[in-house]
Amino acid sequence: MRRYLPLLGEAARRYRRPVGARWRVDETYCRLNGRWAHCYRAIDQDGQVVDVYVSERRTAAAARALFERAIAETGVRPERVVTDEARCYPPALRAPVPNAEHRTSKYLNNGLERDHGHLKQRLRPMRGFKQCASADGFSRGHALVQNLRNGLSSLTDRVPRSLRLATVWPQLARAI
């Protein structure tokens, strides 16, 4: 899994829809070596998963790492970021996106909170991870599959929902 997911992600990146300038960011929990870890997730206004970052601590440095990696991979700096009222987000936004409007509301993030359920549903039978790199890689792979399944790629936008993954996997496998 660690070997092929980065290759699939790289192959799918050129078919990715442009990322929007309004992001919703939140964290959820996952088991990491018997302890709870924080899985930061960012989605844009269309529901496309922008990036995922797993950290053992809920700090401003971890949130800043999510923003920096998302900006580096997508090339998009968000104009507006909606988060919950966690204290780690304002200092994390200052350096990478100083001009972004930061809105805090527990109700504006309902779409992202609902989106966490898809990841949690897949993680529950797995009973957690042993290493942070495994959790991060799996979460990124899950985000890739979720974006493809939701039609957020030029490969899947005209394919019926039930056939999207079956249509895309052979194309991505050839690109590796």
Describe each PLM feature range:
Residues 26, 42, 47, 67, ...:
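Mobile genetic element proteins and their domesticated derivatives, centered on retroelements
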Residues 33-49, 59, 67:
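Short conserved beta-strand segments at catalytic cores or DNA/RNA-binding microdomains
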Residues 125, 134-176:
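C-terminal domain-tail junction helix/linker
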Residues 105-124, 135:
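RNase H-like two-metal-ion nuclease catalytic core shared by retroviral integrases
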Residues 19-32:
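Two-metal-ion RNase H-like nuclease active-site motif
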Residues 1-21:
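Short, basic alpha-helical nucleic acid-contact segments in DNA-binding proteins
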Residues 78-89, 93, 106:
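Acidic/histidine-rich, metal-coordinating catalytic segments
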Residues 3, 52-75:
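Active-site beta-loop-alpha junctions of metal-dependent nucleic acid enzymes
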